[in-house]
Amino acid sequence: HAVATANCTTALHLALLAAGVGPGDEVVVSPHSFIASANAILHDGASPVFVDIRADTLNMDEQAVESAVTPCTKAILAIHQIGRPAELTTLAETARRHHLTLIEDAACAIGSEYRGRPIGCNDWSPLVCFSFHPRKVLSTGDGGMITTNDAQLARRLRLLRQHGMSVNDLERHKARTIVTEEYPILGYNYRLTDVQASIGLGQLRRLDALLARRRAIAARYDAALAGAPGVQLFREPPHCRWNQQTYLVRLPGVTAARRDAFMQALLDAGIASRRGVMSIHREACYIERFGRQSFPESEAASDQCVCLPLYTQMTDVEINQVVAAVRQHAPRA
């Protein structure tokens, strides 16, 4: 089952609701993500319990999740950061052992693979949430989707998505008899529009070509930046295949200020970049709720990582310009 939604934030909200997450519950999640991952938990009335990341994957340390589980834990939210799959085998086993629901935040991960299987196949978890934001590999302008292999979950998701309506518009309009809808539960207006869906279907037919081009650009970056002073590259593990939504490099040992100066030098050379992934626990609204917390690996990665340009229309000349600027301006720790 694939349930389309207005965006991935609404997908996460619905997935958590469908899993029974509510007030007083806890959800184990990485602090190293866009803030929506944790916000969706708060919007359900639950509390995020952060677990630090691994420096090599930028994903939640799967071995540390066990110690974060309490009697209040209801779910584990596994984030495939920038399209790089989390260690689902270990996380699924932890979830099974503690009778928790494993939910995948696959906002960035359409087209990525884990142990030979596509993210979204539901082999490890019953709920996988995708984003079709403009930054993603497949975009509908904005949009989201939840995949599930559970028919009851799919029905609940569709009810929640459309005001709790018992009959969807298509079924009602195709019916040869009068159909009066009912509203057995309180729901939301979280639907994807037909126009966005039509764009998504067109993009889906191009997905293999989009992925191939992104992987080719990433391979050129890998070759050209290998051994560049002051630049650390991330290597794809053999059991994963990244979709290369984002090409991320690390400037080891630098402060956020030096990282920002590097980004400014790129911008002055006509090259846009972005900081790496944020650390949610450092944002004011989370400090106000939970106090100051320390997750050193997430904080260091947030301060030292930079996203370089990568888009399917990128030319080899542009790639070479980025490489030259990175080699010229990369700070030495």
Model-derived segments and their meaning:
Residues 104-138, 155, 179-184:
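Conserved active-site segment immediately N-terminal to the catalytic lysine
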Residues 121, 130-131, 144-149, 201:
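Short beta-strand-to-turn element immediately C-terminal to the catalytic PLP-Schiff-base lysine
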Residues 5, 51, 308:
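Hydrophobic residues at beta-strand termini and immediately following loops
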Residues 17-106, 113:
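PLP-dependent aminotransferase-like
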Residues 1-22, 45:
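Conserved core of the PLP fold type I
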Residues 63, 67, 75-79, 84, ...:
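PLP-dependent aminotransferase class I/II
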Residues 1, 23-26, 72, 155-156, ...:
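Short acidic capping loops at alpha-helix termini that bridge into adjacent secondary structure
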Residues 3, 28, 49, 101-103, ...:
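Structural detector of well-ordered beta-strand residues that form the stable sheet scaffold
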